[in-house]
Amino acid sequence: MVSLQAVQQANVGIGSLPAGLVALFMGATSGIGQSALHHFAQHASSPRIYSIARPSAVRSHETFLDSLRSSNPSGTYNLIEADVSLISEIDRIVADIKENEPKIDILFMSAGFMAFEGRKDTREGLDPSMSTRYYSRLRLVQQLVPLLNNAPSPRVVSVLGGGLESPLNEQDLDLRDPKNWTFWSSSMHSGTMGTLTLERIARANPNLSIVHWFPGTVATPGLVRANQFGMSPPNPTSADEAGQRWAFIATNDRYAVRGGLVPVPIGLSPVQKSGGGIFLVDPAGEGSNNERVLAGLRKRGVDDAVWRFTEGIFASAAKAGRSSQAKDEL
């Protein structure tokens, strides 16, 4: 396990990295994401930060960004208002980023929730608990690959269930049949499909370091909701510690396909990639081996099937978005 002390000591080195790192955060309005953004901004030199907030969270998140402006006035903090359960909104976000930045150094994604109340599809016909945890995340990475590849040591960190992948319902990947959908199955499908598709992106972009991190149980607003539905995991990690650990994972060469960021702490060794080419990281900051599940999925071509299916979802969402826009203009 990587001790919190080692994490904190290493994170001081973030301040020695080149000034002007560009970081995009999706899911930083509360919980792990907000803590991660806080700790990154605390250490980074003149960072250029973009943070996405859903409409209902804009006011509170702007207040939070104001606190970062006060604590590190050398940075630039930009709020992007968007509903990330919609693929069309992701495309708009990417278009805005591309107009303002030639590169992205760090992409952080933790948006999402467990739909304890049941499935309620978006206007694009998707389960929002899956779109925030899978479709929108993949779309964001996919569309930002050119900007990520323009950075010297790009890093993507998706916070969900790296190392916890499980068999998929291959006949109903988006769990559209009500008999197949539960809040748990939607979570497991999101995590497993996320790993398989991120591996595909990593294989096509060998200089891009991609981490799928399972942070364990963390004391966040999401955990409060889980408690209301009878789920009470013991001994949760504080959001503050989780944010510090994310800053370590996002900037340390321990989780890199090549060096260029903060050196690996003395006494620790680089984490090994999964068989598919990404870093699956557990709550202790160590590599997680789940080849027992993943190797079989790859061997049978399930990763390719998931990719093709997801491309179809993106095409359908784009069509639904255009149809909705046309109706709004009538």
UniProtKB/Swiss-Prot annotation:
Enzyme Commission no: 1.-.-.-
Enzyme's top EC category: oxidoreductase
SUPFAM superfamilies cross-referenced by the UniProt entry: NAD(P)-binding Rossmann-fold domains
Molecular function via GO: oxidoreductase activity
Span list, region Interaction with ASS1: 158-202
Function according to Swiss-Prot or TrEMBL: NmrA-like family domain-containing oxidoreductase; part of the gene cluster that mediates the biosynthesis of notoamide, a fungal indole alkaloid that belongs to a family of natural products containing a characteristic bicyclo[2.2.2]diazaoctane core. The first step of notoamide biosynthesis involves coupling of L-proline and L-tryptophan by the bimodular NRPS notE, to produce cyclo-L-tryptophan-L-proline called brevianamide F.
Protein name listed in UniProt: NmrA-like family domain-containing oxidoreductase notO
